[in-house]
Curated annotation (Swiss-Prot):
Record's subcellular location: Nucleus, Nucleolus
Family of the protein in this entry: Belongs to the RRN3 family.
Residues in the signal sequence: none
Protein name: RNA polymerase I-specific transcription initiation factor RRN3
Biased composition (Low complexity): 633-643
Subunit details: Part of Pol I pre-initiation complex (PIC), in which Pol I core assembles with RRN3 and promoter-bound UTBF and SL1/TIF-IB complex. Interacts with POLR1F, EIF3L, TAF1B and TAF1C.
Residues carrying Phosphoserine: S170, S172, S640
Region Interaction with POLR1F, residue ranges: 500-651
Modified residues (Phosphothreonine): T200
Organism: Homo sapiens
GO MF annotation list: RNA polymerase I core binding; RNA polymerase I core promoter sequence-specific DNA binding; RNA polymerase I general transcription initiation factor activity
Maturation and modification: Phosphorylation is required for participation in rDNA transcription. Phosphorylated at Thr-200 by MAPK9/JNK2, which abrogates initiation complex formation.
Length: 651
């Protein structure tokens, strides 16, 4: 069982919400105690403790003259694995009285001192060691980096390696109950050093980058390190932007190696395995009561665990970041506008640098989704930021298209965005689309081409996708006024244009958009859809003989950034503010059912579509290539609307 770690800092319990302030207060108290200890140490004569006689100062001076025997003996005594607390205290007292002589010539000696096992020792050892660090960096700044590196190395659990001969039979995290206290001490050490050397944060950041564990290290190692980085950002606020950027960069590396499909497959396989009968079950359960009790205690933790190993790491770290964000932005249960605005500035810059250019990341972007839920103003600022990215022709097309993807997904999925904001965004997008079409009417590029008009198609899809998710709200209340508003958007001109967005946008989006607009007689898309489907398809010769037909069902390379979160811990932050697809009632489905046409386009090899085909041959069902029970990115498979490929009834 892992030792408790997060109760000292991160939110989740009542005591933790103001932990940052309390932690700083405790640190200041510790520093005051340190000053008193230092005065006592300096005012009291050093105790003679060197076993070989003389003082450390004399040994150092002899070494400079070429007499190295005592110096080698000194090093050997410091390297003694059985060194006692009193010995460490006495050595540190000696070194503090000789601090002016510990120049760069004694780098090897300082390295040995910095490797002393000072944590998990008596409080006197800890306080004396902290005082030594403060004296060392103030008198010999050349050793600042080694001191910071030593402290950063303690931000992860120590490794316990057990060998049998020359073979490592165990290499695991040491789950010491003192781990949280050791982390507290290390943070005190950093703050003490910073008091002596104000430029400490500037030297610290490269070390934190260097010491970041490899992303395939254990979940516990990554959790501890990220936890400690977030704590550093509290008392070194100048480092917050760089620390958050570092963490999110590492999260992205995990994210791109844990696709939704892979996570879902792993969970499904595990569920099927657990649901089956295990022939070996109970074979080695010597004490059934003990086993049952163990499973009961471990139950809640195991329910939150991800089967996919990379997803497990990602989920733990994502939940840490989301907890940290809430802890920073909320003061006494209320959003602090100033603190939230500062954090928003940091995160939007990181979003532009890391997230927007990254294609098909699954979960990391939810940090922006969560932050925007704190107050509507931040959601509107995020939308405005994305809108500027989309319409700015100086931005690369891939960035503009990504901005369109984010706008559509955010408007559709963010439960905290009111209808008036949705309508304002639709007005902006649709007006821009009409202006774009105006500029193409007399041009030579007025034809369907993703390479030429990628941002246009991305904006179209954002409009269609938002409309599909929000059409009930747009038409609720006064149906007549709702229809008048939708008619004012003039979808027909966009759909009928020579740029032919219905050919480029995802079939799942197009077909549901067509069904809804047909129902309310806003625009009739089926003629265009049929014409697009009848166009000549590329035929590729198969090496095994015969011809094969391949269709690109996602020419826009679309993904929906805010598809449902499937990380179990992180979902708890997102679900309350997340708009899931509401399944249609039987009556609503009946309204959409149309006679089936026999010439529906065959399967289009797209793993976006995994829905069940209705068995009723008289009703148009799901074309396997265009829909599934989950209206999501092409790489996804769960969590959204069933999309029926509908054709108008024959006259």
């Amino acid at each position: 069982m892992a030792a408790p770690l997060l109760h000292t800092r991160l939110p989740g319990d009542a005591a933790a919400s103001s932990s940052a302030v309390k932690k700083l207060g405790a640190s200041r108290t510790g520093i005051s105690n340190m000053r008193a200890l230092e005065n006592d140490f300096f005012n009291s004569p050093p105790r003679k403790t060197v076993r070989f006689g003389g003082t450390v100062t004399e040994v150092l001076l002899k070494y400079k003259k070429g007499e190295t025997n005592d110096f080698e003996l000194l090093k050997n005594q410091l390297l003694d694995p059985d060194i006692k607390d009193d010995q460490i205290i006495n050595w540190l007292l000696e070194f503090r009285s000789s601090i002016m002589y510990l120049t760069k010539d004694f780098e090897q000696l300082i390295s040995i001192i910095l490797r002393l096992p000072w944590l998990n020792r008596s409080q006197t050892v800890v306080e004396e060691y902290l005082a030594f660090l403060g004296n060392l960096v103030s008198a010999q700044t050349v050793f600042l980096r080694p001191c910071l590196s030593m402290i950063a190395s303690h931000f992860v659990p120590p490794r316990v390696i057990i060998k049998e001969g020359d073979v490592d039979v165990s290499d695991s995290d040491d789950e010491d109950d003192n781990l949280p206290a050791n982390f507290d001490t290390c943070h005190r050490a950093l703050q003490i050093i910073a008091r002596y050397v104000p430029s400490t944060p500037w030297f610290l950041m490269p070390i934190l980058v260097e010491k970041f564990p490899f992303v395939r290290k254990s979940e516990r190692t990554l959790e501890c390190y990220v936890h400690n980085l977030l704590r550093i950002s509290v008392y070194f606020p100048t480092l917050r932007h760089e620390i958050l950027e570092l963490i999110i960069e590492k999260l992205l590396k995990l994210d791109v190696n844990a696709s939704r499909q892979g996570i879902e497959d792993a969970e499904e396989t595990a569920t099927q395995t657990c649901g089956g009968t295990d022939s070996t079950e109970g074979l080695f359960n010597m004490d059934e009561d003990e086993e049952t009790e163990h499973e009961t205690k471990a139950g809640p933790e195991r329910l939150d665990q991800m089967v996919h190993p990379v997803a497990e790491r990602l989920d733990i770290l994502m939940s840490l970041v989301l907890s940290y964000m809430k802890d920073v932005c909320y003061v006494d249960g209320k959003v602090d506008n100033g603190k939230t605005k500062d954090l928003y500035r940091d995160l939007i810059n990181i979003f532009d640098k890391l997230l927007l250019p990254t294609h098909a990341s699954c979960h990391v972007q939810f940090f922006m989704f969560y932050l925007c839920s704190f107050k509507l103003g931040f959601a509107e600022a995020f939308l405005e930021h994305l809108w500027k990215k989309l319409q700015d022709p100086s931005n690369p097309a891939i960035i503009r298209q990504a901005a369109g993807n984010y706008i559509g997904s955010f408007l559709a999925r963010a439960k905290f965005i009111p209808l008036i904001t949705v309508k304002s965004c639709l007005d902006l997008l649709v007006n821009w689309l009409h202006i774009y079409l105006n500029n193409q009417d007399s041009g030579t590029k007025a034809f369907c081409d993703v390479a030429l008009h990628g941002p246009f198609y991305s904006a179209c899809q954002a409009v269609f996708y938002t409309f599909v998710f929000r059409h009930k709200q747009l038409l609720s209340g006064n149906l007549k006024e709702g229809l008048q508003y939708l008619q004012s958007l003039n979808f027909e001109r966009i759909v009928m244009s020579q740029l032919n967005p219905l050919k480029i946008c995802l079939p799942s989006v197009v077909n549901f958009f067509a069904a809804i607009t047909n129902k309310y007689q806003l625009v009739f898309c089926y003629t265009i859809i049929e014409r697009n489907n009848r166009q000549m398809l590329p035929v590729i010769r198969s090496t095994a003989g015969g011809d094969s037909v391949q269709i690109c069902t996602n020419p826009l390379d679309t993904f929906f950034p805010f598809d449902p979160c499937v990380l179990k811990r992180s979902k708890k932050f997102i679900d309350p503010i997340y708009q899931v697809w509401e399944d249609m009632s039987a009556e609503e489905l009946q309204e959409f059912k149309k006679p089936m046409k026999k010439d529906i386009v065959e399967d289009e090899d797209d793993d976006f579509l995994k829905g069940e085909v209705p068995q009723n041959d008289t009703v148009i069902g799901i074309t396997p290539s265009s829909f599934d029970t989950h209206f999501r990115s092409p790489s996804s498979s769960v969590g959204s609307p069933p999309v029926l490929y509908m054709q108008p009834s024959p006259l």
